[in-house]
Amino acid sequence: MPMSKLFPPLLVAILVSGCAGMTSPTPPSPPAPTTPAQRTAAAEALAVERQWLGSWFRDTPVKVAQRGDGAMSIEVPREFSFDPGKSSVKPALAAVLDKVAESLRRAPQAQVPLLAAPDDAAVITPLATQRADKMREHLRSRGVAEARLGRPAPAASASVQLRLIAAPLPLP
């Protein structure tokens, strides 16, 4: 067989095999809302997400509420979040975090500056910080960009706490 007939299929095979291991680049985060109209649109998008999450968790122990500063708060009781003495995320909390990740995909201006988890005694300890870190890891594994997440923190209450904001604020 002449070389000219082998070349096109060989070239296609090389190109396809080279592309097989490539991953698509992560799209950049949208710019922060800077005008009052953009901030209003971001706040309205967060309100829509609060209603959507509220409908998902209606009649469950999960509390979804709007705070006075316009942020959304989500609280999940500790007993549904972590086993005593463990930092692994339980399935109920994983389901909440999955919905939060979906909500963050739908509201690209939203951020989660607070991810707080309690210790078994509702005190601040390394276990509480480890739990908050596991929550952060879970959200990252669901495609939430690290830049949209605040540092993990211990919670001073008996519930897991998440706070979502509409416009980027300085993360702690």
Task: Describe the predicted segments one by one.
Residues 1-9:
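Bacterial N-terminal signal peptides that target proteins for export
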Residues 15-18:
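C-terminal motif of bacterial Sec signal peptides marking the signal peptidase cleavage site
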Residues 20-23:
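Bacterial signal peptide processing site
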Residues 38-47, 57, 67-98:
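Short, solvent-exposed beta-strand/turn patches at coil↔beta or beta↔helix junctions
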Residues 52-61, 83-115:
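Periplasmic peptidoglycan-binding/anchoring modules of Gram-negative envelope and division proteins
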Residues 59-61, 67-77, 84, 107-109, ...:
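Extracytoplasmic
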Residues 68, 76-80, 86, 93, ...:
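A mature extracytoplasmic/lumenal domain signature
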Residues 117-172:
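Periplasmic OmpA-like peptidoglycan-binding domain that tethers envelope proteins to the cell wall
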